[in-house]
Amino acid sequence: MKYIFLYCLCVLSITLNGQSHEIHGNVVDKEGTPLIGATIVVLEESDSTMLSFGITDDSGRFEIYDLTEGSRILQISYTGYAEHTSLVSIHEQGKISVGEIVLAESTTMLEEVSIKAEHIPMGILGDTINYNAAAFQMRPGSSVEDLLKKLPGIEVARDGSIKAQGEDVKNVLVDGEEFFAGDATIATKNLEAEFIDKVQVFDKKSEEAEFTGVDDANEEKTINLKLKEDYKNGGFGKVDLNGGTESTRNAKINYNRFSPSVQVSAIGNINNINENAFSLADYIDFMGGFQNALDGGGLSMSREFGNGQPEGINNQNALGTNLNLQISPKLKLNAHYLQANSDLNTDRQSTSKTFTEVQDFTAIDTSLSNQKTTNHRLNTKLKYKPNPMNVFSLSAKGFFLDNDEITNSARTVLIENSLQNQSTNIQQTNARSSGINTNLLYKKKFLKKGRNLSLRANLESTNRLEESAIDYGIFGIDIDENSLQRQTFESRLQALSGTFKYTEPISRNLYLTLSANATSQEESPIRQYFDLSSAADKELLDLSSSFIKSLDQYDAGISIKRNSKKLKLKGGLQFADLSLVAQEGEVQLNDKSKYAYFLPSFSIKKKLKGSKDLDFDYRAQVNSPKLSKMVTQVNNLNPNFLILGNPNLNPEYIHRAGLSYTNFDEFNFSSFIWAVDADFSKNKIVNSRAYLPGLVTQILPINADKYISLTSYIHHSSPIRKLKIKYSINSTLNYNQYQNQIDGVSNTVKTAMLMTGLRLENRKKDRFDIAAGIDLDLNAVSNDFNSNFDSPFLNHSLYFDGFLTIGKGWNIGTKYDYKTFNNAFFDEGQVLHLLDATLSKSFLENKLTVKVTAHDLLNQNRGISRTGGINTLTDTRFTTLGRYIMLGASYRIGIAKKRDITIEEGRD
């Protein structure tokens, strides 16, 4: 199979590598000054079809590659200058020089210049790169994600994540407005390329920097999708219906209605093929910011495992709406709502090998489970700006989660193939969580430039109620127990905080900031245990208890920063005073409750020549223990793993430093990023383990004296002109070292993880889009007491993706994966061959698309996970989706009539 993959790579390079011609020259103004960033386009003489393009570099030089013989039109444009057009005859192999081309200043407005907008693929103005969507030929029904794949300097991974200029894109705007903020893929997967006029890439400043005019160096790589004029007023969207073998189904709809003052969008999805309408980050964010409400419970979530397939078979439906409303020139509302229901069935088997100083043992676990979950999340933000000097904003985030789960599991424990014990566990759980987080912010800037004030108040309230019934039995050597229990777990969190920040300009580029913050938080869980084996449903008072964790924290800080065009420096010192109390009833449990810390910080951001940046950041921070780590109530929802809390935990004190170098060459669209992060923690909270009679695992959090974490990241992407392809390399190395305890014995744990990937793809994607790559994952864990445990996991995968337009309206696609999972402790390596295919045809002027989709044609898909803990190796198999074939149709709603496109430079 490796040879087949290598053959595919050869086909890729041979297919793309034909005779190649080049045109080069220089672009200057009448004074002979190089014009940097001028757009160069080569067109077919017969029909003005764009063949290739580029932009001039720092010296005004350009080189256009991948040209074939024939008569070509050379078109050069630059903002504020008249367009240059000339005819070039390409008749031999090699480079053709057009010499120095002088552009004259334009005497007309940009919109009056006689040019064809669809020929200008991109332009650069300031910090913004503008891509003209009309210049890139798209097949019918293409999404924005498909469009982004064609844009030089932008990379789209197989999971839909986006990099622009080598940096991760976390936010995608639509006409400058938030679109389901927090999930960039909702816009790129649900909006069609047909709707887009321009794609703009820029570094978005923080809201504070945009308002005050003082750069705080907190920038985020952002993409803005500018709609065509026809789609800025009216409704448009898409309906997609699919059904197939094995009773599979997948129905999607998205609809958008925009006007100058209102943007309304809705998306919906119903499917049973394990497809998420929202990203995993969205599902996590259903509870994000409210994590304390979940601590201590037994809620589980669907997770991604070793072969990239979700665990189990999931029937789900999801709905999302987004609203941007300009109520008045001074008042603006943004809101989005996400809702998801899932019904997940899982069949799971695992074999784990545990290594201890006394004896090693093997555990074989099986489980059947059904989990029904309903999630709701609502985010709103109301912004009022009465005048340019003041702004008020009120934001509120709310969530509701309902989870019903029933699990039937069994466990067998062996020592050297000798049976030690067997256990069974039937558990039924219902959990409900709800919460709200409100934030009120006032910002004011004064007449003196740079002087500003901000006040913030935050209120958070969450509630959680969980009820479980457990029927558990274990018998074997040293143990014989049965338990029929009902447990209730109720937790409340109340938190209030306030922040003050004042900035005073000391000189032109020097600013002094004073800040203060006060936080008060209380969490009060109650866990009750009842014995169901008695007729009276007797409460087990020796286990039941209430607990209170309270945290009061006061911070005061001072910082000074210096900003210039090329260099930004910031240094600060913060003092934190904490009062952390754990108590049962009126009895305080923790020996120490008062803590004080000095938290220094320093950062430097240096802009080097061209698009090169060098950043360094250091800061100290303190993290207080979570409720689940401190609560004394025993969590025995899984009686084979008893989870205890430690009320005497100290806060973590962390020194964190990071250094990064970024280089993006917008002239040849290559990028390079190198980053290294180092954490040194004192009192890092880690989980110690002890093995009780029956080899039941007891987990107790403790403070590690020292915890070291090092992470290095490298990303490089660049075109290979002669092969007409581009490549990208990603590599992440993580190393951790800390002290832990197993059965009360101190143990040094070292973990290392290396993830490396190489991807090759063709550059010109008009008719075909081909990509191939390899991913390697190496994980290793070592400890002091057992050298035999130091056995790494090596997983690697090869993949090939292809999409081809084979005729008018006809498209065919394929996706192939070759995956291996290896570890010396397991009997044999596992190999998977996964093959998907699609065939589609467009009708009715591309409004209707009919398609056939085949998943796992070789019927080899299996759920596999091989992982390692501090002293445990685990091999897991689980149910996942197998082979099916679907027939479907999609229909585009609200297609507007075509209009001439006007190119705009910059962003609004």
Predicted regions and their residues:
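Membrane-proximal, glycine/serine-rich, low-complexity loop/turn segments characteristic
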Residues: Q19, G32, R61, A82, ...
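Structural motif
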Residues: H24-L35
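A short, solvent-exposed loop/turn motif at the edges and junctions
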Residues: L43-T49, S71-L87
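Short, acidic Ser/Thr/Gly-rich low-complexity loop/linker segments typical of extracellular
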Residues: E45-R61
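Outer-membrane beta-barrel translocator domains and adjoining extracellular loop/strand segments
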Residues: T212-G213, A277-Y283, T346-A363, E405-L419, ...
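Outer membrane beta-barrel strand-and-loop segments of large Gram-negative receptors
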Residues: T366, A495-S497, E539-S545, L644, ...
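Signature of Gram-negative outer-membrane beta-barrel scaffolds
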Residues: Y511-D613, F785-D790
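Conserved C-terminal beta-signal and adjacent last beta-strands/turns
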Residues: G757-L778, D790-D908
